[in-house]
Regions:
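Mid-domain catalytic core of redox enzymes
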Residues: 23, 214-334
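Short, well-ordered alpha-helix to beta-strand connector turns
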Residues: 2, 24, 205, 223-225, ...
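N-terminal Rossmann-like FAD-binding beta1-loop-alpha1 element of flavoenzymes
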Residues: 2-29, 366
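C-terminal catalytic lobe of FAD-dependent flavoproteins
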Residues: 314-381
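Glycine-rich FAD pyrophosphate-binding loop
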Residues: 21-46
Length: 381
């Protein structure tokens, strides 16, 4: 019997498995997919590491987490600087002086602030109650209508008036000339891709792929003293309170026999009429070079589409509105009665976590498990 059965070979599962093994525990990792690394999985085409489930740029202010991931991969110095395309007009992101200069022709922060203040006053928003009001409060009506509204409504499948304000609070606004999207001390992408990094995390650990845990739960539960579950928490409990809502993302990926398509890794299409939310050109995550530093003659692009999640498909983003969060709390209360199961990760905790937060939580959980075990040993249980 194993000490832990880890369900899911994504970042949470891989980090937990690695750290538990270091503490002398026996581990079995299983995953329903036929590959490791979860949604950060990368695969190689034409010398290019393809982000199969969408763009993943690692960023963190946590030095402990940064040092941790650097044990398993060398990170390049990629800086996330996406571009917004509104009906052929290109705007730098995040919202900064370059954006304001293109939008209004201003060059000084005071000029941009004056325009924003007028647009806020005109909208009459003092305490934003939804995403639309929050966006106008942050960046004014012009930027909201051109660069936020259409993109966000495609991404979430709802009118901005019907989305919670907190979603837009993640978007940075700067009055400096700075196209670095993430205000993080550490940033980059693993040289050789994320899959290679997760492979190193799982070295020496037994892994079985193509295994559906929930389809044979009783059998798998007998294999270990404790289960670490990183799948959908509502599915674990057979949707007994109802189904939590997610957004689903699909991709159309093409290999193009040209050296350059858009000259940028990520371009967001912010008008409502363009069906895709963004186009990723993967070669620019590695600066247009292969692993040996050679120029790449071809390129690979992925058009990204957001839709409502359907059961049986891969869920991507939890929809953390009031209705779904209330439903999640019911499942969370049930999960706390499962003494031999740990629920973790985006799906297990129904939270939109960045990669560094997933790793942080997995490291913390292993430490908590060690403390519990030491307490039991001390008390003679």
């Amino acid at each position: 019997m194993y000490d832990y059965l880890v369900v899911g070979a994504g970042l949470y599962g891989a980090v937990f498995a690695r750290e538990a093994k270091k503490r002398g525990k026996s581990i079995l990792v299983i995953d329903k997919r036929h590959h490791i690394a979860g949604n950060v999985y990368t695969e190689k085409k034409e010398g290019i590491h393809i982000h199969k489930y969408g763009a993943h740029i690692f960023h963190t202010n946590n030095k402990e987490v940064w040092d941790y991931v650097n044990q398993f991969a060398q990170f390049n110095h990629y800086i996330n600087s996406p571009v917004a395309n509104y009906k052929g007009e290109l705007y730098p992101l995040p919202f900064n002086m370059y954006t304001f200069q293109k939008m209004w022709g201003v060059t000084l922060p005071e000029e941009a602030k004056e325009i924003l203040d007028k647009q806020r006053e005109g909208a009459g928003v003092k305490e934003p109650c939804n995403l639309e009001e929050q966006a106008i409060f942050l960046v004014g009506k012009d930027i909201y209508e051109k660069l936020i509204q259409g993109y966000t409504e495609k991404q979430w499948g709802r009118a901005c008036k019907d989305l919670p304000a907190f979603i837009i609070k993640r978007i940075p606004v700067r009055f400096t000339y700075d196209n670095n999207y993430f205000d993080a001390r550490y940033q980059g992408i693993p040289v050789g891709g994320y899959t290679q990094m997760v492979e190193k995390m799982l070295e020496g650990i037994e892994v079985k792929l193509g295994v559906d845990y929930l389809a044979n739960k009783e059998i798998w539960d007998k294999q270990a003293k404790k289960v670490v579950y990183t799948g959908q928490i509502d599915a674990y409990f057979h949707y007994c309170f109802g189904t939590l809502e997610y957004r689903e993302v699909s991709f159309e990926t093409e290999v193009l026999d040209i050296p350059d398509f858009q000259r940028n890794a990520v371009v967001n299409y912010t008008d409502r009429d363009t069906l895709w939310t963004r186009i990723i050109e993967h070669k620019w995550f590695q600066f247009g070079k292969d692993d040996k530093g050679n120029d790449l003659d071809k390129t690979v692009i992925s058009r990204e589409y957001s839709t409502n999640w359907q059961k049986g498909n891969e869920p991507y983003y939890p929809i953390n509105d009031e209705k779904n969060n209330t439903l999640y709390e019911k499942y969370k209360a049930l999960s706390q009665k499962e003494d031999k199961v740990i629920f973790g990760g985006r799906l297990g905790e129904y939270q939109y976590y960045d990669m560094d937060k997933v790793i942080e939580r997995a490291l913390k959980k292993v430490e908590e498990e060690e403390i519990i075990e030491n307490q039991r040993r001390t008390s003679g249980l």
